């Protein structure tokens, strides 16, 4: 029997239920460099003190349970327990608090996003003492970051592989997302790539359905890629969605894509799961494939301000799990995304060191210690009139993806691609000449449209299209 066990045994085991805050609320605790730190938005039930609510979160997401148990005496709770080390009220919200929790690193399996989330956001989100709970941010210590491989390539290596520099990359999601035959699908891919796009994309729910089986789609898309490359002299790609019902089937599809010689595959990382995503990312790393990530199902998890997981946490988890691109919202399109919040998690995806900045929703300083970065993908309800704003907001290290904004062109798919490429080149040139895209954007597009009939036609079609709705997830004032 260890000295520690002997000491506890001599005190005697006291059965019963006690307040969580007696053990798990430790405002005097000084966080360690090796701790995983979490910021939770906590809404306690009426009558539950915020300190008790924060302590309950720390307990239920680490070593605690609802009653004292005899086996507590067989381990060191001080070493392994989570600690709520700070509580602060949320400005402008009644009975809502930010609870800061520190977790010892030994609680987590190395290189496993799955295990990290199972602990931190597992059972605790159904805890009755809380009306609502949201994980706002995580600080991943460098010691834990180093157990992950992360993205296969990183931004600079991807640019080198594609030989594309000095501008955002251009993409298009093939529409309609469901119902096309494989041959017609491949035709649309070819027309878009030939027109000037860098990538085309399977939509998130294109897997292997009766109207288009995955192998047929892969073959016709590969033909489109190689034909468009030969005609344009540019490297092209199509995000072949390898997401499947089993990990084995997913890997079979990724292997076939590699055998075809295409540059990139795709995965729906939330519906597919982090275990599957990490496995696919490791395969892509070993076999020279880029990995595009779609965030299908994210809004179920992150859209409500008081409950769920903020997308900045899901973005950090993806960078750890592995992926070269991930959809990040557009700010200006049809999908949710406030500007400052979006730019906050875009920096968390791309940069190596990000300072704490509550004005952008970043609760902790994050050091990625050279873990490769991820390209944010702006996609959803965007068209040529949005090009100046997108170029200004996201900068060069991004993918701007126009689905309907390419395929909805009145003259067809290839002219739609031409219009987007011309608009992008015009915005990049104007920016490089010192013009302000935020204030002169529309003028820049009109000037370019004078010598591009394809762009002029696109401008006419979408001149009145706007998506002006207030974002659900906003910064605390």
From Swiss-Prot:
Protein name: Ribulose bisphosphate carboxylase large chain
Protein purpose: RuBisCO catalyzes two reactions: the carboxylation of D-ribulose 1,5-bisphosphate, the primary event in carbon dioxide fixation, as well as the oxidative fragmentation of the pentose substrate in the photorespiration process. Both reactions occur simultaneously and in competition at the same active site.
Family: Belongs to the RuBisCO large chain family. Type I subfamily.
GO terms for biological process, alphabetical: photorespiration; reductive pentose-phosphate cycle
Locations listed in the record: Plastid, Chloroplast
Entry PTM: The disulfide bond which can form in the large chain dimeric partners within the hexadecamer appears to be associated with oxidative stress and protein turnover.
PANTHER family on file: RIBULOSE BISPHOSPHATE CARBOXYLASE (PTHR42704), RIBULOSE BISPHOSPHATE CARBOXYLASE LARGE CHAIN (PTHR42704:SF15)
Organism: Cichorium intybus (Chicory)
N-acetylproline: residues bearing it: 3
UniProt-annotated binding residues for substrate: 123, 173, 177, 295, 327, 379
Cofactor, free-text remark: Binds 1 Mg(2+) ion per subunit.
Site residues by UniProt (Transition state stabilizer): 334
Record's subunit section: Heterohexadecamer of 8 large chains and 8 small chains; disulfide-linked. The disulfide link is formed within the large subunit homodimers.
Catalytic activity: 2 (2R)-3-phosphoglycerate + 2 H(+) = D-ribulose 1,5-bisphosphate + CO2 + H2O; D-ribulose 1,5-bisphosphate + O2 = 2-phosphoglycolate + (2R)-3-phosphoglycerate + 2 H(+)
Record carries keyword Acetylation: yes
Source domain of life: Eukaryota
Entry EC no(s): 4.1.1.39
GO MF annotation: an example: ribulose-bisphosphate carboxylase activity
Modified-residue entries (N6,N6,N6-trimethyllysine), positions: 14
Record: active site: 175, 294
